[in-house]
Amino acid sequence: MGIQGGSVLFGLLLVLAVFCHSGHSLQCYNCPNPTADCKTAVNCSSDFDACLITKAGLQVYNKCWKFEHCNFNDVTTRLRENELTYYCCKKDLCNFNEQLENGGTSLSEKTVLLLVTPFLAAAWSLHP
C-alpha cells in the first residue's frame, strides 16, 4: 500500500472514530424525585459526562452529572443537603445502590482523614 492508500485508510478510520464517538451518550439511572429504588435509565445530554448516586438520610438521588462537580461541596450545594454520601462514575448505568454502599464518599470519612493526617505527619517528623 502506497502513501495514497495509507492516507485513504487513515481518513476512513478518522471518520469512523468521529461517528462512533458522537453517537454514544452516557446512560445513567435518573429519577426526578429522590427514591430508594430508581430504575429509570436515561441517555444523558452531552453536557453530562458522569452518573451520580447520593444518599442523604432516607433520600437517594440518582442523576446525570458533570464529573467536574463530583466533589462534596458541589454535590451538597446543588442537592441542598448538608450530610450525604455520594458516588460518581463514568460508565453506563453505574449509579446504583450497591455502588454507593461499596465506594461512596461521606463527610465522616473525609473528616477522619483530615484530622488524622496532621498527627501522623507530626509523629513522623518527631521520630528519630
Curated annotation (Swiss-Prot):
<feature type="glycosylation site" description="N-linked (Glc) (glycation) lysine">
    <location>
        <position position="66"/>
    </location>
</feature>
<dbReference type="Pfam" id="PF25152">
    <property type="entry name" value="CD59"/>
</dbReference>
<keyword id="KW-0472">Membrane</keyword>
<dbReference type="GO" id="GO:0016020">
    <property type="term" value="C:membrane"/>
</dbReference>
<dbReference type="GO" id="GO:0007596">
    <property type="term" value="P:blood coagulation"/>
</dbReference>
<keyword id="KW-1015">Disulfide bond</keyword>
<feature type="signal peptide">
    <location>
        <begin position="1"/>
        <end position="25"/>
    </location>
</feature>
<feature type="glycosylation site" description="O-linked (GalNAc...) threonine">
    <location>
        <position position="77"/>
    </location>
</feature>
<keyword id="KW-0225">Disease variant</keyword>
<dbReference type="GO" id="GO:0005789">
    <property type="term" value="C:endoplasmic reticulum membrane"/>
</dbReference>
<dbReference type="InterPro" id="IPR045860">
    <property type="entry name" value="Snake_toxin-like_sf"/>
</dbReference>
<feature type="disulfide bond">
    <location>
        <begin position="44"/>
        <end position="64"/>
    </location>
</feature>
<feature type="disulfide bond">
    <location>
        <begin position="28"/>
        <end position="51"/>
    </location>
</feature>
<keyword id="KW-1003">Cell membrane</keyword>
<dbReference type="InterPro" id="IPR016054">
    <property type="entry name" value="LY6_UPA_recep-like"/>
</dbReference>
<dbReference type="GO" id="GO:0033116">
    <property type="term" value="C:endoplasmic reticulum-Golgi intermediate compartment membrane"/>
</dbReference>
<comment type="function">
    <text>Potent inhibitor of the complement membrane attack complex (MAC) action, which protects human cells from damage during complement activation. Acts by binding to the beta-haipins of C8 (C8A and C8B) components of the assembling MAC, forming an intermolecular beta-sheet that prevents incorporation of the multiple copies of C9 required for complete formation of the osmolytic pore.</text>
</comment>
<keyword id="KW-0732">Signal</keyword>
<feature type="disulfide bond">
    <location>
        <begin position="70"/>
        <end position="88"/>
    </location>
</feature>
<keyword id="KW-0971">Glycation</keyword>
<feature type="propeptide" description="Removed in mature form">
    <location>
        <begin position="103"/>
        <end position="128"/>
    </location>
</feature>
<dbReference type="GO" id="GO:0030133">
    <property type="term" value="C:transport vesicle"/>
</dbReference>
<dbReference type="GO" id="GO:0005886">
    <property type="term" value="C:plasma membrane"/>
</dbReference>
<dbReference type="GO" id="GO:0005615">
    <property type="term" value="C:extracellular space"/>
</dbReference>
<keyword id="KW-0325">Glycoprotein</keyword>
<keyword id="KW-0449">Lipoprotein</keyword>
<dbReference type="GO" id="GO:0005925">
    <property type="term" value="C:focal adhesion"/>
</dbReference>
<dbReference type="GO" id="GO:0012507">
    <property type="term" value="C:ER to Golgi transport vesicle membrane"/>
</dbReference>
<dbReference type="GO" id="GO:0001971">
    <property type="term" value="P:negative regulation of activation of membrane attack complex"/>
</dbReference>
<dbReference type="GO" id="GO:0070062">
    <property type="term" value="C:extracellular exosome"/>
</dbReference>
<feature type="glycosylation site" description="O-linked (GalNAc...) threonine">
    <location>
        <position position="76"/>
    </location>
</feature>
<feature type="disulfide bond">
    <location>
        <begin position="31"/>
        <end position="38"/>
    </location>
</feature>
<dbReference type="GO" id="GO:1903659">
    <property type="term" value="P:regulation of complement-dependent cytotoxicity"/>
</dbReference>
<dbReference type="GO" id="GO:0070821">
    <property type="term" value="C:tertiary granule membrane"/>
</dbReference>
<dbReference type="GO" id="GO:0031982">
    <property type="term" value="C:vesicle"/>
</dbReference>
<dbReference type="GO" id="GO:0030449">
    <property type="term" value="P:regulation of complement activation"/>
</dbReference>
<dbReference type="InterPro" id="IPR056949">
    <property type="entry name" value="CD59"/>
</dbReference>
<comment type="function">
    <text>The soluble form from urine retains its specific complement binding activity, but exhibits greatly reduced ability to inhibit complement membrane attack complex (MAC) assembly on cell membranes.</text>
</comment>
<dbReference type="GO" id="GO:0009897">
    <property type="term" value="C:external side of plasma membrane"/>
</dbReference>
<feature type="domain" description="UPAR/Ly6">
    <location>
        <begin position="26"/>
        <end position="108"/>
    </location>
</feature>
<feature type="glycosylation site" description="N-linked (GlcNAc...) asparagine">
    <location>
        <position position="43"/>
    </location>
</feature>
<dbReference type="InterPro" id="IPR018363">
    <property type="entry name" value="CD59_antigen_CS"/>
</dbReference>
